[in-house]
């Protein structure tokens, strides 16, 4: 998986029918674009008819434009995208009117993450009901309205939309005169009022774990007694940026390049200190890693495995559509039809990857990986490779993504409403194809923290590691 464009590009206008309103035309434009670029239409031949019927039904509902606004329209576009069964392809919702809270999902529970000062007593509280609907019912509804691949992802992504009145209406939650009641696990209740101009919010403050609390950097490490703790938060560095520029046919910007860390230099520094202090245990924490460029995972494995070891790798396929050829100069000369998936093994190597010199550093001690609900995309890709080949033990909780999945998103703009969308153009098959049916990556040892434990600074995974290594 490769992180590509950051700027949203307009999709072509496929439909501009004067008999249709702006939302109807926009819906049909998105449908046509999906059929041109998304690989699932080449894998599931029955999808074309199913999604076309759904689009027709939505289009009929859109005929009364007075009943619709942009936010409600975007909610229904996501309903269409659910049919792709692809957590990478989604549309962020826009709304100027929101309820004054932010909800987050953590290990099966929804809680108040942020709210206005007058509701500060609700911060951190676990929700049991919203407007008399049980949270378990709401969670099930999210999978029908939020692009996802399992209930963990629908909970994570859907929690971002639960302050949006258009989204709440779609999933069957109604409010009276803009008042939304909520009940919490401790038996308390609160009512939130709809606001056009959101006030400044307070955020739930939990106790930070001394070692494992997330740092705002792509990667960092520290030596703790006889353990090297390596927090791997994002698969982005100078090399991945250069590769992205080559794919787009753009020049690298020196100020951006200089601001990014060098992953291989980071590993050299870390391994040098490990050798100096004779550290025998390396813990690699990927619980906060939402992905990036999977090549950083390849670089990491080079330093952890014997040089000539053979293991099963992912099979990666890209749908080289006409749109992709026009947008990415790398694909412009590849002679592959729009209705074919190209195996990436048959494509030419990116110059920066082909010419890189391997660091030559290697760690030969015990390695333990940690995963969690927010391990996603290229991070999930790396850990699935490790799991399917039984390379290293993995502890933690289940991830929010299928190991066999879609990805490599194209950020786009719909032409009439300028709605932003992210659409996948690649398909990834896990090394162990017998497990393609799995909707999450299971750790070897399941260890979970509740929101109550997390708020007190407890980390059950770190406690487990200490119990095994001390």
Where are these regions (language model features)?
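Short glycine- and Lys/Arg-enriched binding-loop motifs that mark or flank ligand-binding interfaces
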Residues: 287-288, 392
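Flexible, low-complexity junctional segments that flank or bridge functional domains
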Residues: 2-282, 288-290, 294-317, 325-330, ...
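Conserved acidic, small-residue-rich alpha-beta core segments centered on
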Residues: 294-455
């Amino acid at each position: 998986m490769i992180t590509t464009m950051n700027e949203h590009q307009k999709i072509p206008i496929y439909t501009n029918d004067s008999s249709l309103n702006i939302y109807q035309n926009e819906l049909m434009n998105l449908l046509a674009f999906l059929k041109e670029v998304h690989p699932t239409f080449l894998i599931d031949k029955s999808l074309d008819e199913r999604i076309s019927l759904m689009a027709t039904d939505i289009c009929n509902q859109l005929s009364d434009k007075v009943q619709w606004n942009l936010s409600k329209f975007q909610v229904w576009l996501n309903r269409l995208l659910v049919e792709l069964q692809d957590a990478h392809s989604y549309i962020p919702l826009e709304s100027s009117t929101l309820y004054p809270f932010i909800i987050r999902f953590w290990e099966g529970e929804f809680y108040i993450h942020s709210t206005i000062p007058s509701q500060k007593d609700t911060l951190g509280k676990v929700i049991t009901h919203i407007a008399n609907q049980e949270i378990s019912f709401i969670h099930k509804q999210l999978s029908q309205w939020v692009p996802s691949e399992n209930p963990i992802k629908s909970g994570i992504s859907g929690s971002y939309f639960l302050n949006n009145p258009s989204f709440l209406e779609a999933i069957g939650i109604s409010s009276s005169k803009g008042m939304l009641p909520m009940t919490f696990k401790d038996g308390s209740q609160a009512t939130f009022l709809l606001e056009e101009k959101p006030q400044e919010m307070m955020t739930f403050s939990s106790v930070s774990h001394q070692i494992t609390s997330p740092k705002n950097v792509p990667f960092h490490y520290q030596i703790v007694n006889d353990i090297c703790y390596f927090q791997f938060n994002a698969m982005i560095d100078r090399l991945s940026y250069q590769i992205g520029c080559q794919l787009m046919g753009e020049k690298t910007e020196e100020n951006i390049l200089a601001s990014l860390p060098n992953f291989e230099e980071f590993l050299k520094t870390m391994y040098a200190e490990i050798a100096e202090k004779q550290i025998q245990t390396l813990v690699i924490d990927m619980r906060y890693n939402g992905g990036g460029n999977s090549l950083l995972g390849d670089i990491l494995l080079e330093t952890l495995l014997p040089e000539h070891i053979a293991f099963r790798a992912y099979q990666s396929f890209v749908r080289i559509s006409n749109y992709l050829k026009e947008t990415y100069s790398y694909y412009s000369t590849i002679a592959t039809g729009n209705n074919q998936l190209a195996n990436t093994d048959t494509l030419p190597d990116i110059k920066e990857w082909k010419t890189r010199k391997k660091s030559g550093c290697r760690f030969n001690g015990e390695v333990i990986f940690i995963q969690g609900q927010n391990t996603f995309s290229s991070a999930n890709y790396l850990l699935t490779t490790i799991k399917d080949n039984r390379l290293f033990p993995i502890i933690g909780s289940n991830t929010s993504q299928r190991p066999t999945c879609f990805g490599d998103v194209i950020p786009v703009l719909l032409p009439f409403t300028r709605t932003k969308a992210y659409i996948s153009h690649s398909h990834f098959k896990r090394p162990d194809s017998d497990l393609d049916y799995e909707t999450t990556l299971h750790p070897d040892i399941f260890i979970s923290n509740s929101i109550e434990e997390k708020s007190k600074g407890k980390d059950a995974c770190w406690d487990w590691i200490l119990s095994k290594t001390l």
